[in-house]
């Protein structure tokens, strides 16, 4: 006879913690438990972009929070609506990863 297995919440493991109920976005971790923050080189390496992937929820809220906390110009941070990625002009990979970890992701 088959016994029905019901998942118990205490037995489940999550890839990342939920930072706060007030956040309107969530950044999931990769399968290797890393934050999905990457560098992208354009125009033969002369243009460097920082990409934040795996955003669930309001990516524009993440953009606005990054602008205010990292003191960046609003024209240097934008959302790619097609891929749902936040793009920052320049190499900000270390500061973005530290900020995401401080937020609980």
From Swiss-Prot:
GO biological process terms held by the UniProt record: mitochondrial translation
Keywords assigned by UniProt, alphabetized: Mitochondrion, Ribonucleoprotein, Ribosomal protein, Transit peptide
One Gene Ontology MF term: structural constituent of ribosome
Gene3D superfamilies hit by this protein: SUI1-like domain
Cellular localisation: Mitochondrion
InterPro entries for this protein: Ribosomal_mL49 (IPR007740)
Domain of life where this protein originates: Eukaryota
Transit peptide, from-to: 1-15
GO CC, any one term: mitochondrial large ribosomal subunit
Stated family: Belongs to the mitochondrion-specific ribosomal protein mL49 family.
Purpose of the protein: Component of the mitochondrial ribosome (mitoribosome), a dedicated translation machinery responsible for the synthesis of mitochondrial genome-encoded proteins, including at least some of the essential transmembrane subunits of the mitochondrial respiratory chain. The mitoribosomes are attached to the mitochondrial inner membrane and translation products are cotranslationally integrated into the membrane.
Subunit structure as annotated in this protein's UniProt entry: Component of the mitochondrial large ribosomal subunit (mt-LSU). Mature yeast 74S mitochondrial ribosomes consist of a small (37S) and a large (54S) subunit. The 37S small subunit contains a 15S ribosomal RNA (15S mt-rRNA) and at least 32 different proteins. The 54S large subunit contains a 21S rRNA (21S mt-rRNA) and at least 45 different proteins.
Protein name, UniProt field: Large ribosomal subunit protein mL49
Organism of provenance: Schizosaccharomyces pombe (strain 972 / ATCC 24843) (Fission yeast)
């Amino acid at each position: 006879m088959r016994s029905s297995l019901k998942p118990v919440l205490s037995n489940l493991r999550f890839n990342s913690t939920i930072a706060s109920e007030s956040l309107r976005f969530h950044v999931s971790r990769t399968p290797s438990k890393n934050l999905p923050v990457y560098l992208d080189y354009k125009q033969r390496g002369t243009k460097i972009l920082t990409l934040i992937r795996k955003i669930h929820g309001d990516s524009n809220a993440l953009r606005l929070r990054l602008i205010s906390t990292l003191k960046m110009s609003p024209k240097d941070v934008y959302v790619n609506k097609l891929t749902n990625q936040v793009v920052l002009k320049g190499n900000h990979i270390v500061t973005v990863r530290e900020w995401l970890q401080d937020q609980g992701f």
